[in-house]
Amino acid sequence: MQLFVRAQELHTLEVTGQETVAQIKDHVASLEGIAPEDQVVLLAGSPLEDEATLGQCGVEALTTLEVAGRMLGG
């Protein structure tokens, strides 16, 4: 299925739904140079856990995931 990932640019990925959020972060890192530990992947504004698969998160075909930078501070 196709998935859209919006980071600094919009990317289209071909996925099966079995990929983990961490794998998506690795892919974004290779495309945009943002370290995975500095990324937060959001679905409808809610952050997704690295260990969860896309299917477990409810990601369907043609879904757009947002990638935000992790905020520093406390």
Curated annotation (Swiss-Prot):
SUPFAM superfamilies in the record: Ubiquitin-like (SSF54236)
Gene behind this protein: Fau
Family: Belongs to the ubiquitin family.
Additional facts recorded: This protein is synthesized with ribosomal S30 as its C-terminal extension.
UniProt organism field: Mus spicilegus
Signal peptide: none
Identification of the protein by name: Ubiquitin-like protein FUBI
PROSITE patterns (UniProt xref): UBIQUITIN_1, UBIQUITIN_2
